[in-house]
């Protein structure tokens, strides 16, 4: 099954600046309520988020002034400042809008260096093999071109990818974006530019709140669970249309350039292909896609 990037679900759409979605006061200590909304469904207890994909896919923002203007124009309440650690896990801070704007005019937001050197389970016992023996601070510097909305939140919230810098103004050499940048510079020195198009494979699983229980295969639209292998099965892929449509809608809102979808060999295992593009841009998109899916 191939679904174009512009695929639409049945979700109700509106727009944050002019909609009746409850807004929070920027900078207030109270955190905004969060809710994950499923395409085509509306909770009686809480209104489903309304967003306009054309209105909320931000233009290319090249500098800090344009970023500040966009944050205020679209009534962004909080900014999620994100960095990938060495395993690609999302690390960072959630900052009220005006505090984030203040940080743009200073050295940026500080995090401990070990934040980037954790295992997938959060262990960092061996970080001194990579970083300094002292758990020193590093600085998160937002890349304005990466700012996107978080379309599944009730309050207007932005997400932005940050680079990591030392107090001496040098890039943190083991930060993933810095590593990739050095690789790209090596290619550029030889007159080459990588063009990449990764594919991401993942499993859909039944909701599980008990860590002692194994993950299960979810029930599809037919009311049944997959029991065998269905590589490239069309009907097998269609079993999960509701969540697939939602993924494509959220990717469009976040300007994540995905294309073809296929069912892989495992039960409820899907594969989504990214469109060809610049290596850094695609790496950023894959990083954001992992939280979308």
Residue ranges and their predicted role:
Residues 200, 264-272:
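Short, conserved phosphate-binding/catalytic loop or strand-edge motifs used
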Residues 36-47:
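Short, Lys/Arg-enriched N-terminal segments with co-localized hydrophobic residues
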Residues 2-12:
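Extreme N-terminal basic, low-complexity initiation segments
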């Amino acid at each position: 099954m191939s679904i174009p990037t512009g695929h639409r679900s049945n979700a109700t759409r509106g727009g944050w600046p002019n909609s009746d979605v409850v807004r929070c006061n920027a900078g207030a200590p109270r955190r905004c309520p969060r809710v994950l909304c499923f395409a085509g469904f509306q909770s009686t207890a809480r209104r489903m988020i309304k967003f306009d994909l054309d209105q909320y896919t931000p233009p290319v923002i090249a500098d800090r002034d344009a970023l500040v203007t966009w944050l205020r124009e679209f009534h962004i309440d909080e900014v999620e400042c994100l960095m990938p650690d060495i395993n690609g896990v999302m690390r960072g801070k959630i900052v009220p809008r005006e505090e984030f704007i203040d940080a743009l005019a200073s050295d940026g937001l500080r995090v401990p260096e070990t934040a980037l050197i954790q295992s997938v389970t959060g262990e960092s016992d061996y970080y001194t093999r990579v970083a300094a023996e002292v758990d020193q601070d590093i600085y998160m510097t937002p890349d304005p071109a990466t700012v996107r909305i978080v379309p599944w939140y009730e309050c207007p919230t932005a997400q932005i990818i940050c680079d990591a810098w030392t107090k001496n103004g040098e890039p943190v050499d083991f930060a993933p974006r810095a590593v990739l940048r050095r690789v790209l510079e090596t290619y550029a020195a030889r007159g080459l530019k990588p063009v990449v198009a990764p594919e991401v494979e993942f499993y859909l699983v039944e909701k599980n709140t008990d860590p002692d229980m194994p993950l299960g295969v979810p029930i599809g639209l037919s009311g049944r669970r997959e029991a065998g292998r269905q590589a490239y099965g069309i009907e097998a892929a269609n079993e999960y249309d509701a969540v697939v449509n939602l993924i494509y809608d959220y990717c469009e809102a976040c300007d994540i350039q995905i294309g073809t979808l296929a069912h892989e060999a495992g039960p409820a295992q899907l594969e989504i292909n990214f469109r060809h593009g610049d290596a850094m841009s695609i790496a950023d998109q894959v990083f954001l896609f992992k939280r979308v899916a």
